[in-house]
Amino acid sequence: MDGRAVAPAAGTVLNALATGVGSAFALDFDVEATVSLEPERESVSGDIADHADADTGLVERCVALATERYGDGEGGHVRTDGEIPLAAGLKSSSAAANATVLATLDALGVAEDVERIEAARLGVQAARDAGVTVTGAFDDATASMLGGLTLTDNREDDLVVRDEVDWHAAVWTPPERAYSADADVSRCERVAGLADHVADLAAAGDYGTAMTVNGLAFCAALDFPTDPAVAALPHATGVSLSGTGPSYVAVGDADGIQEVATLWNENPGTVRETTTQLTGARTT
């Protein structure tokens, strides 16, 4: 019983750490999950390609929850591989959870029978169980699972808005890593007033302004430099720290994003030029 699926990375419009309301959008690079189920096996094991020491508790929990709910509690093995750097603010955990849940449903033969948003909720529950998220990250999960841009209330796992956005994007990932579960939530809560304003902007469809206000606020709250965002502003529709960092994402038209990428390439780390993604997670 084998299944395989991919799910995209995502960037941030609104970080949910301040109020529980968040917004994110899918980016066109993926993580892939391959799941092999064994009916006679009770446990689940996992590995992450090129990261032998990485914690696989999240993806193992995804398999277990999916087989408990939609199968007969089968055990097995899950392997993830892909282009999304770990602990970089690009929603690698949400993408891995989405891909793993879909791959497990594929292995069970029910991938087309389960609504995508319910599959995303299953991955969010696994993330909470595994302790890799503060807010549940339903915004990140829905953006990656459904594609496009989503605005969510993570306190209720409620999808408020889904919209399709057609942007070019530049992604700068510095060499350091930051784990969202380690973020200083109390400092983030101090920018709740700005976060409410960002949510209003996003709900009104002013995504670029929302993203930029979020970026400046959460750079301050999480102690990241604003210089990369300020450098990008003349060329971008919107720019923000992504998640809890350290990556920054700028969106806009092709020429503007090429200018941003050129500027960001002067910094250490890696710069990727990509686009938004509208189809979300899918079996392969």
PLM feature spans:
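FAD-binding core of FAD-dependent oxidoreductases
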Residues: 12, 18, 87-97, 127, ...
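Glycine-rich, charge-dense phosphate/pyrophosphate-binding loop(s)
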Residues: 204-284
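Short beta-strand-to-loop capping motifs
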Residues: 37, 174, 250-254
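Acyltransferase
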Residues: 163-225, 233
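DPxDG-like acidic metal-binding loop motif
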Residues: 90-118, 145-147
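Alpha/beta catalytic cores of group-transfer enzymes, especially the acyltransferase/condensing modules
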Residues: 117-159
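ATP-binding N-lobe of GHMP and related small-molecule kinases
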Residues: 1-85, 277-284
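Short glycine/serine- and small hydrophobic-enriched flexible loop segments
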Residues: 64, 101-109, 200, 216
